[in-house]
Amino acid sequence: MTAVFPGELLLAEGIHEIARVTALLSGPLRRAPRVAQVVGPGFAGRPWAPRLTDALRPLDPTVVVHDGPTTPDSVAALARQLRAIRADVAVAIGGGTVMDAAKAAAALADGGPPDADRVRQACAAGPAAGDTPPAVRVVAVPTTAGTGAEATPFATLWDLKHRRKLSLTGPRVRPSAAVLAPELLAGLGRRALATGILDALCQGAEASWSIRSTPESIRWGTSAVTLAAEALDQVQDDAPDAAARLALQRAAHHSGRAIALAQTSSCHAISYPLTLRLGLAHGHACGVTLGRLLRYNHAVPAGDCADPRGTGHVRRVLDALAAPLGGTPARAALRVERFITACGLTPYDALDVDHRSLAAEAVTYPRCHDNPRRLDRESLGRLLGERSEMEETCG
């Protein structure tokens, strides 16, 4: 299946579509395209790697390995590699780290010689109006179940030197095409699938409840949550079938569509210091506060509402998000918190973190203030310091 969505993102499903989509993107060329196959260090060990390698063989790609977190240094190095082989298309096969690295590198590869400082400057500059398409087009092929990076016009980078999360943003960063292949989730364990589904849930929820949300972002976001909810039990039981794996990939993609319109908000703002301090996987770091924020936002009083559309709008959105997860925001929150524990992930209450210090850092990220109920250092510190409903139920 192949479809083109607004914004000219070409979407296809199935490993067999990757080479065809790549060829479509390079159609105007009067020569064979130069293709970079960007992968992570574990690519060769994945059970589907031989099949994917065979599918790309007609394109004679140059394999480029991106190792470690996506940082200004790693993006600069990858951009130099893309320049060295004069790539026309980069096929990014991996999770959010690999896809974001390829997106950022492709966006910066046709400027001057890239280095880490230039990458930081590009992140600080923000999106530029009227950007021309990058010389290197990106085909994003997700091999995890959560990031939605194949649909977004931004890439997450980690400045480990300054302990900050960075974002490279703009139309040049969005992939030209995405290929969803649920068979690429084969071999992922329960924890990996769980962190992915938590990321998709948070992205869908945050892009829906954000004060920047639009009717379209709410539609994509609630669809992402609905699709993810359908697969929760199978992931928890460590037995997702083919239909569940496809639902996971579609949920992630829909969540990416949602945040491309409205971005993320509070769960993600809290997740960044959790990842930097404790090394939590991204989806895990986001998901541990989703239950708290579902309850907190649904209980918004008029005097605390940050959304100009009012408390009625906020509650309607929260009710729509909660429906597929348990019927009410309280039940949805409890289901998410129980899912985290059942999948062997550490819940927020068991993390070794100072609530007030975490809150103080989280509110420095502007997206924290896109939450529909106002959050400041004091209110967020109190919220994080409360015992979860699950702990109270089990205690």
UniProtKB/Swiss-Prot annotation:
Pathway: Secondary metabolite biosynthesis; bialaphos biosynthesis. GO terms for molecular function: alcohol dehydrogenase (NAD+) activity; metal ion binding. Belongs to the iron-containing alcohol dehydrogenase family. It catalyses: 2-hydroxyethylphosphonate + NAD(+) = phosphonoacetaldehyde + NADH + H(+). One of its GO terms (biological process) is antibiotic biosynthetic process. This is Phosphonoacetaldehyde reductase. The lineage of its organism: Bacteria, Bacillati, Actinomycetota, Actinomycetes, Kitasatosporales. Fe cation binds at residues 199, 268, 282. The gene is phpC. It holds the Pfam family ADH_Fe_C. Its cofactor is Fe cation. Its EC number is 1.1.1.309. Catalyzes the reduction of phosphonoacetaldehyde to 2-hydroxyethylphosphonate, a step in the biosynthesis of phosphinothricin tripeptide. Phosphinothricin tripeptide (PTT), also known as bialaphos (BA), is a natural-product antibiotic and potent herbicide. Can use both NAD and NADP but the preferred substrate is NAD. InterPro entries: ADH_Fe/GldA, ADH_Fe_C, Alcohol_dehydrogenase_Fe, PhpC.
